[in-house]
Amino acid sequence: MASVLGSGRGSGGLSSQLKCKSKRRRRRRSKRKDKVSILSTFLAPFKHLSPGITNTEDDDTLSTSSAEVKENRNVGNLAARPPPSGDRARGGAPGAKRKRPLEEGNGGHLCKLQLVWKKLSWSVAPKNALVQLHELRPGLQYRTVSQTGPVHAPVFAVAVEVNGLTFEGTGPTKKKAKMRAAELALRSFVQFPNACQAHLAMGGGPGPGTDFTSDQADFPDTLFQEFEPPAPRPGLAGGRPGDAALLSAAYGRRRLLCRALDLVGPTPATPAAPGERNPVVLLNRLRAGLRYVCLAEPAERRARSFVMAVSVDGRTFEGSGRSKKLARGQAAQAALQELFDIQMPGHAPGRARRTPMPQEFADSISQLVTQKFREVTTDLTPMHARHKALAGIVMTKGLDARQAQVVALSSGTKCISGEHLSDQGLVVNDCHAEVVARRAFLHFLYTQLELHLSKRREDSERSIFVRLKEGGYRLRENILFHLYVSTSPCGDARLHSPYEITTDLHSSKHLVRKFRGHLRTKIESGEGTVPVRGPSAVQTWDGVLLGEQLITMSCTDKIARWNVLGLQGALLSHFVEPVYLQSIVVGSLHHTGHLARVMSHRMEGVGQLPASYRHNRPLLSGVSDAEARQPGKSPPFSMNWVVGSADLEIINATTGRRSCGGPSRLCKHVLSARWARLYGRLSTRTPSPGDTPSMYCEAKLGAHTYQSVKQQLFKAFQKAGLGTWVRKPPEQQQFLLTL
């Protein structure tokens, strides 16, 4: 019996020892939890500042944490809440991570304030992105940009325009693509998916009547107010002094939170270290407070290409890259190069990507030109109504195709024969469609300048030009010009078209590598182009008359020249700033990569340009329905039409004159006469020597800035090993100006 009692006492002592050890373990565990909970109190609001933190918990955990934020939003609710039981805490879901807001033995007072939330995506917010964006910007129009991929796995692209920027989203369905576009638009000016999360991130619950979806100006004093420590509440009087100090320190970080939101105002410029090579930092020093907006973010990770945009001095610059950081750098570099002529070391100049032209807009430009051609050729014979190459220049206000207007139209594929050269400027040397369209566009520009000669104010207000205070004229805001060509321009752009390599593949690739990017010349009285030969840059008059082949530069090279010098030419440079193309639309034989390389990238070595001149990089696009190839010989004539002119002019491409033998309205002689009538009566950008120049060549050389930029371009071609720009005999420009 004694042994039984002894064993009972021994087992009782062992049991009591185990209980004591268990209590000590629980006590130590409770202390560790207290420390972790206090630390998380201050770190939780700043978790969103770390870009590397991602949330991988399931939907149950997400909903539990969201409910937890709502429960802990009001401090008064925390004080009146009974502490959770230990069994419930142990039996709860492991993903809940619920912290005890009250501590036993402390009079039921608040020990610590725990702010815990998950980084909600737009798709799980109380209001999805479409609803939020509709409330902020009602009446937005979503349009389907494209549909790519196989039939069983399509990829849709939907775009929406918000605040002057176009955001494009992609997805396996139109609904998801539309949702993605709305998310990108919201992220450009909203940081948090809902009001609750925004308030909690800034240290307080939402005030009464605050609507996060209303205009920003409606709640500057509630949502974005300065966060001061609140007055002590009765329920917090018994809190520990250390907790109050920690809470005060957390509130002291309010400015960091405001900067993270980036909604209160522009961020201060970050000082760059000497020799800073980061274009984003340098641009921020020059223009503080810039915001970068993500315009496109593909859904497929293996083909990521982000597009970021930044607005500087009222102009929008865009860049693309495999990450948002690289895209921001490209956009910043584009702004630095365009506005400040700054080229950062280690950054390829001019490769910042612009937003692709909407396919619907490109198709509308093509349809406008082809429809206008059918309209103006209805009274012509079938022989004159056909064309092998068609070109036109369309004027728009912004990228609104509804207000588009065709201002110049032409056709043709031939050049003048050398025996028909004129030393009085009475012939048109190059009758290719693109070149004739540009000369018809000069006719249109002269008409617009002549409106400023009228004494009636309404006439000058109808002009596309406005007068500058410092002298001269410039285009009105949002006036854009677009070139449409039915086939890829002759020269290097057409040579490397993927549809034209039909011979042996190995020899074709070798030819491509050898002559890639070279300047090319047209064949006299024929079609096609050949690379420039020899270092000679000037042809001789007597040599051409004796049978030497007349050399004319290709259309590809001429368009590349327009992208630096402008469409207006030397004479009009006396009056107007350079006029550049906004876009080029090609109907067939089109390859965007090759076209971009020969149109823009060959000019990267030109260097810094004078004010108002730039390296223009027009938007490039094909059309949805490419024009069919037209076999047979090209017509031996060229047609041109200009808005405001009732008659349609037909030029014999071999002689460079009208069919009746008279000079064309687009020849040097006629256009220079219009210039002479304007000179001295209109304000000029160049210093006037007094008297009107007597000769055509003197008038052209008088545009000193234009001539210096032209020489700069020609030297860049030579330095890059692309060949020498061949000029016509100088005798062609040595004729007297007539009024």
Curated annotation (Swiss-Prot):
Q: Which residues bind Zn(2+)?
A: 432, 490, 555
Looking at the record, which segments are called Disordered? 1-36, 53-105
Report biased composition (Basic residues) as residue ranges: 20-34
Enumerate the InterPro entries for this protein. Answer: A_deamin (IPR002466), ADAR3_DSRM_1 (IPR044460), dsRBD_dom (IPR014720)
* Molecular-function GO terms, alphabetical: adenosine deaminase activity; double-stranded RNA adenosine deaminase activity; double-stranded RNA binding; metal ion binding; RNA binding; single-stranded RNA binding; tRNA-specific adenosine deaminase activity
Domain DRBM per the UniProt entry, residue ranges: 125-191, 274-341
Under which EC number(s) is this enzyme classified?
3.5.-.-
Where is it found, in Gene Ontology cellular component terms?
cytoplasm; nucleolus
Q: Where is this region: R-domain (ssRNA-binding)?
A: 23-35
What's an example Gene Ontology biological process for this entry?
mRNA processing
Q: In which tissues is it expressed?
A: Brain specific. Expressed at higher levels in astrocytomas as compared to the normal brain tissue.
Provide this UniProt record's keywords sorted from A to Z.
Hydrolase, Metal-binding, mRNA processing, Nucleus, Repeat, RNA-binding, Zinc
Q: Which residues form the active site?
A: 434
Q: Where is the A to I editase domain?
A: 408-735
- What subcellular locations does the record give? Nucleus
- Role noted for this protein: Lacks editing activity. It prevents the binding of other ADAR enzymes to targets in vitro, and decreases the efficiency of these enzymes. Capable of binding to dsRNA but also to ssRNA.
What's this protein's name?
Double-stranded RNA-specific editase B2
Q: Whose protein is this, by species?
A: Homo sapiens
